[in-house]
């Protein structure tokens, strides 16, 4: 799959989607994007900057949601032009999709909305690459149906429907907890789409702090290494210069000053894993 000027897939080098959970300001976005671009460049790692203009599914209505679509897209457009990186953001309604698509390079659909047929079709109908997050409640094999909806929407709008990614972000494990089943990464290859692993939301403790979600960021490297060892196309990580001060999802964000070393490990591991055919593909 062609994605933002590079090839994405299990037979291609790992790519990175990373950035703060939510836009916290124009200069903040430009600075974090610049640091991430520099890290990725040193590692030869294809990179897409991620940040949200609105967090529509916060635990509490008192939590910071973001700058809103107009101001948020203006900031993302400046990041794209000034820093020189492709940008990704999530949309929450069908009506938002065309406006967001006019600015960003990749659209993302929230995990909670993966079963919403009209929404999935509308986002794919923009013709932009789409990163579809698998719901915490969904079996990995059920993503076949979600991808079929997206392709239907894209093809009805005159596009080929071949610019879709699927993203694992953990499965509900009792209350206020998630677990990652690495088999799901292999199962979702059956969609024919590049598989992305979200290493930070997978350590989230949904609603675990009462009015906000908790997280166990110490397990981000553990799960990221496991996913890359399984064999994936891309890794997704939310990062922040000081996660304890982040306005959204701080407990599961990986510290930006510690990111380079983790990425370096993942790049080396990815090269090793992809240097030979995956054994399971021979069965």
Swiss-Prot record:
Pathway(s) served: Carbohydrate biosynthesis; 3-deoxy-D-manno-octulosonate biosynthesis; 3-deoxy-D-manno-octulosonate from D-ribulose 5-phosphate: step 2/3; Bacterial outer membrane biogenesis; lipopolysaccharide biosynthesis
InterPro entries reported in the protein's UniProt record: Aldolase_TIM, DAHP1/KDSA, KDO8P_synthase
Alphabetic keyword roster: Cytoplasm, Lipopolysaccharide biosynthesis, Transferase
Gene Ontology MF term list: 3-deoxy-8-phosphooctulonate synthase activity
Broad class of enzyme this protein falls into: transferase
Disulfide cross-links: none
E.C. numbers: 2.5.1.55
GO BP: keto-3-deoxy-D-manno-octulosonic acid biosynthetic process
Protein name: 2-dehydro-3-deoxyphosphooctonate aldolase
Source organism: Laribacter hongkongensis (strain HLHK9)
């Amino acid at each position: 799959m062609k994605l933002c000027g590079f090839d994405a897939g299990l037979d291609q080098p790992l790519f990175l989607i990373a950035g703060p959970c939510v836009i916290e300001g124009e200069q903040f976005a430009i600075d974090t994007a610049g640091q991430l671009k520099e890290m990725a460049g040193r590692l030869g790692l294809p990179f897409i900057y991620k940040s949200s203009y609105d967090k529509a599914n916060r635990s509490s209505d008192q939590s910071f949601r973001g700058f809103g679509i107009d101001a948020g897209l203006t900031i993302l457009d400046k990041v794209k032009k000034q820093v020189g990186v492709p940008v990704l953001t999530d949309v929450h309604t069908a009506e938002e999709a065309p406006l967001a698509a006019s600015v960003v390079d990749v659209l993302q659909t929230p995990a909670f909305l993966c079963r919403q047929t009209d929404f999935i079709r509308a986002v794919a109908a923009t013709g932009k690459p789409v990163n579809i997050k698998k719901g915490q409640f969904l079996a990995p094999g059920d993503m076949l149906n979600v991808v079929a909806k997206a392709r239907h929407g894209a093809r009805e709008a005159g596009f080929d429907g071949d610019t879709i990614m699927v993203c694992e972000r953990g499965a509900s494990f009792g209350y206020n907890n998630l677990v990652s089943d690495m088999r799901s990464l292999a199962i979702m290859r059956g969609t024919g789409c590049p598989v992305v692993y979200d290493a930070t939301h997978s350590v989230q403790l949904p609603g675990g702090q009462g009015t906000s979600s908790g997280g166990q960021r110490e397990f981000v490297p553990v799960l990221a290494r496991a996913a890359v060892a399984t064999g994936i196309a891309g890794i997704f990580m939310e990062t922040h210069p000081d996660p304890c001060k982040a306005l959204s999802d701080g407990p599961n964000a990986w510290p930006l000053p510690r990111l380079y070393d983790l990425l370096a490990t993942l790049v080396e591991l990815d090269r090793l894993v992809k240097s030979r055919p995956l054994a399971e593909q021979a069965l």
